[in-house]
């Protein structure tokens, strides 16, 4: 009996070397787990089992009995629990055991998952194995690697998930735009932005109108100061006007006015080209009208100080001087200039403008006739034969000065006619037509000044030899 047990034990020790080739080619991880499990299994005491069960277990590993006996459940394995029975491995052809990462349970993994169940000859394989006996749970050598691999897999999964979300971003955006709450919020944002733009536009218009009003007030203050200086200069020297002082002040102020008016007309032309609203154009039109009123005030001051300086037109360019009428432009000529730029006009506007032009023409003729009569009377007074007498000189000079004062009245009437004509044109025309009217009149005088500059700067022919 002892000899048979010894032979069985030797036969049991040689069993691992007789494993088939498919099982020997298992992964190193499985071999390491096998060694660890074999070490743990060696800690068990064989005395815990009865002899009959032990003999039955040893007899079951006989080669002939394995081939003859029907395959049954292996309750007491002599090999490590993760190693399958060689006979069972040969019959199942491709079933491998793998240890889970925690080292507590085993799982059966078929090596050929594509094989159908009916081709396995009705063999039944246990999908679970009893857990390890109580004892110290030693970590496997490759558990750290498995944990690292699992963490890498999790990271890859998370990264792939992020990629999926980014690829689905357009779809999500489409769903968001269809959300009623989002649409309502976007509509509210657009409405708030529109109101903000309107407030900003109104604020800019208010600033622009305030700036123009401030400039007008500054001009009025400056004109009043100049008028006071001119009147003070005219009262010097026993009531005789001091011409050079008042004339120089007027020339400086007229040059400044031309510069300011050119800037305003440039802005008005830009507003017309940009198709601005009528409210904005109204500000520029009112500014242009205010500047013309300022110029007429300056002319009234210089007329009281030095009427001859205003009538001779030294303050104007040579080309402007040729078209001066009583110290300024003819209102009828200004209407003719602006009619070519303000078209189209309605029939009512044409009739009103035609009547205004005829009335201005009649007033011009009357004032021109009055001025001609005053000039002729002044010439006769100065050329009287009794002026050389001792008592007649001062009397004739007093009469001549009265005639000069009448000339001042005629010039003021001419300035009033110019001012009335411009104001009536502004009321007859629409805002855009009035803007074009002021632009046309300004361009007319600007071209006259440019013509004078070109004439003065023309190349002069060389003088011939002296006779």
Curated annotation (Swiss-Prot):
Domain bZIP positions: 179-223
Segments of this protein annotated with the region Disordered: 1-42, 105-184
Location of the region described as Leucine-zipper in the Swiss-Prot/TrEMBL record: 207-221
Keywords attached to this entry: DNA-binding, Nucleus, Plant defense, Transcription, Transcription regulation
Subcellular location: Nucleus
Domain of life: Eukaryota
Residues of the DOG1 domain: 247-458
Entries under InterPro entries matching the protein: bZIP, bZIP_sf, TGA_domain
Stretches that traverse the bilayer: none
GO biological process per UniProt: defense response; DNA-templated transcription
GO cellular component, one term: nucleus
Region (Basic motif): 181-201
Coiled coil: none
Sequence ranges of Polar residues compositional bias: 120-129, 158-168
GO molecular function, one term: sequence-specific DNA binding
Record bears the keyword Secreted: no
Amino acid composition bias (Low complexity), ranges on this chain: 25-41
UniProt biased composition (Basic and acidic residues): 1-10, 145-157, 169-182
Function: Transcriptional regulator involved in defense response.
PANTHER family xrefs: TRANSCRIPTION FACTOR TGA9, TRANSCRIPTION FACTOR TGAL7
The protein's assembly and partners: Interacts with NPR5/NH4, NH5.1 and NH5.2.
Family (UniProt): Belongs to the bZIP family.
Protein's recorded name: Transcription factor TGAL7
